[in-house]
Amino acid sequence: MSPFSERLRALRLRYGVRQKDLAEAMGFEQSYVSALELGIKGPPSRDFVDRLARYLRLSADELAGLLSELEASRRHYTIPQTASSDAYRLCGELWRELDLLSDAQIRVMRQLIETWRRGPVKLGDRPVLGRVMRKDKEGTEM
């Protein structure tokens, strides 16, 4: 299930709206709303999101969260022409292994990316990913 699917279902349930009523009010089929919630259909158009926001009277924060999940749910990406051959290989390897990765492995990769996003890691820095590293025995008094 995509992040958008999860958010759509959560919003619909929070506002107490049936799929049929939501779809009808927005001008869509109930089967389309169901397919979106199940992740069978790819992310919808911005028009769908705007109609949903108007119908549910979403707050600015709720709409921003929904748009963030819409972006996170993209299924197709284009590798930039300026990417290195290693970047192409990495994308291909990740694509081939995607269905085989556990949730824990995905979390570790996302934590790594977040670490890089925060800034360059200096030589000797050891980022901690999900656990505390023990001090070396050297330098400890006995």
Language model region names:
Residues 9, 20, 50:
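Residues within the helices of the helix-turn-helix
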